[in-house]
Amino acid sequence: MAVYNYDVVVLGSGPAGEGAAMNAVKAGRKVAVVDNRPLVGGNCTHLGTIPSKALRHSVRQIMQYNTNPLFRQIGEPRWFSFPDVLKSAEKVISKQVTSRTSYYARNRIDTFFGTASFSDEQSVEVVCLNGMVEKLVANQFVIATGSRPYRPADIDFNHPRIYDSDTILTLSHTPRRMIIYGAGVIGCEYASIFSGLGVLVDLIDNREQLLSFLDDEISDALSYHLRNNNVLIRHNEEYERVEGLENGVILHLKSGKKIKADAFLWSNGRTGNTDKLGLENIGLKANSRGQVQVDEHYRTEIGNIYAAGDVIGWPSLASAAYDQGRSAAGSIVENDSWRFVDDVPTGIYTIPEISSIGKNERELTQAKIPYEVGKAFFKSMARAQISFEPVGMLKILFHRETLEVLGVHCFGYQASEIVHIGQAIMNQKGPANSIKYFVNTTFNYPTMAEAYRVAAFDGLNRLF
C-alpha cells in the first residue's frame, strides 16, 4: 500500500469539493481530491444540475419553436424523443469534465478515483477503481461527497420502468404517460421537462402547496403553468405501494386512488453519501438522512474534519455548495475567505423558471414588518415581447419606512439571471440598500433588467 502525505484531502469533486480544493491550493497547501467516479465533477456534473438543465434548455427550445407564430409559417410542430434531447446534455457533460479536469491539473491537485474511508482522524484508505489501495495522510479533511436519491426499501428500483432522479437519464424512450412522485424542486423541474416533450404527467405532492418555501404568488403561478401544460397535480397524497408491471407501473395511494403510467419517477428526498466513509472509525455520526452536522465554520465534531455541500443538508444547491466548500477551506487556511453562506438565491429551472432571494410576503407578515410590494409584469416589457416570452413577473418587497429591499421574487424568462441585480443591492449596508437605486439607475433598453425600474416605480407609487 502506497502512502501519500498532504496538507488537505478533499473527499468529492463536485461543487463543494472543487471550491474547497481550489481555495486550499491557492493558499499554498498541498491538496488531493478523491472521487468515487472515474471522472471529476461529482453528481452535479454527471447526473444532477448540468444534465437536467441542459435537458431543460433543449426542451424549452422545442417548446419555443412549436409555439412561435413565426415558425408556424415554415412548417408543422416538431417533436423529439427523450433520448434525442439527452444527446445535447451528454455533450455539455463532456465539456464540463474536460474543463474541470484541467482546473485540477493546472493547479497541481492530485486526483484519486475510488472509494475513500477513514482509518483514523489523520488518514483515509482509498480503494481505487483499478483495484489498488492507497493511503492518504493529511492534517485536515473536507467531506464533500454529496448526496443521492433516497430509495425506500419497498420500491423495486431494479424494475425497468421505475426510476429515480439519477437513473432517469438512462430512459431509452419517451413514455406517453409518467408518474412523478415528489413535488419538490427536482420533481417540478422534471414535470416541466417531460410535459414539454408532450408526455402526460401526474405530479404527486404530499403537501398542500407546490414548493411552499416560495412566495405564495410564485407558487400559485407555477401550479397554473404546469397545469396549463397538461401536468395533473395531486396534493396531500402518499404512496401505499408501487406496482411494477411488464407494460407499465401502477401507483397505489393511501387515499385509495390508483394511477397507471408507462414510467414512474421517484423524486422524494435525498440522502447524504456518508455510509461508506468509515465515520464509525473516527467517532463521527451522520443523521438519519446521511448528513453530518457542522458549525458555522463548516467544522464537524472532529476538529480537523470539515464538511460542505449536500452532505450537510440545506440548502442543497450547487451554487451554495461551491461557496460552502470554499468557506470550509477558508477556515482551514485562514486567508479571510471564510463566510457563513446564507444569502443564497433560489434557482428553480422549471418552465418558466423561478428565482428568489430574501423574505417572502408570508414571512414578513408573520414578523409584523411593514412592507410594500412593487411588481413588473413581463407581458408589458419590450424585451419579453421581442423574445415571445410574455409569461412572468418581478416582485420586489421593501420596507415602507426605510425603503430597504427585503426580498426579490421572479418568475419567468431569465429569472435566475434577473435575481442577481436585487441580490447585489440587498447585500449593501445601510442606506445603500434602497429601492430608490432602481429608479435612479439607467438600465439598458430593451432588457429584462429594466423590470426592476418598473417594479420600483410601482411600489413607490403605493406609498402615502
UniProtKB/Swiss-Prot annotation:
Cross-referenced Gene3D superfamilies: 3.30.390.30, FAD/NAD(P)-binding domain
Co-factor remark: Binds 1 FAD per subunit.
Task of the protein: Conversion of NADPH, generated by peripheral catabolic pathways, to NADH, which can enter the respiratory chain for energy generation.
Subcellular compartments: Cytoplasm
GO biological process, alphabetically ordered: 2-oxoglutarate metabolic process; NADP metabolic process
EC code(s) of this entry: 1.6.1.1
Gene Ontology molecular-function annotations: dihydrolipoyl dehydrogenase (NADH) activity; flavin adenine dinucleotide binding; NAD(P)+ transhydrogenase (Si-specific) activity
Gene symbol of the encoding locus: sthA
Needed cofactors: FAD
Catalytic activity: NAD(+) + NADPH = NADH + NADP(+)
Cellular component, GO annotation: cytosol
Lineage: Bacteria, Pseudomonadati, Pseudomonadota, Gammaproteobacteria, Pseudomonadales
Originating organism: Stutzerimonas stutzeri (strain A1501) (Pseudomonas stutzeri)
Family (UniProt): Belongs to the class-I pyridine nucleotide-disulfide oxidoreductase family.
Name this protein carries in UniProt: Soluble pyridine nucleotide transhydrogenase
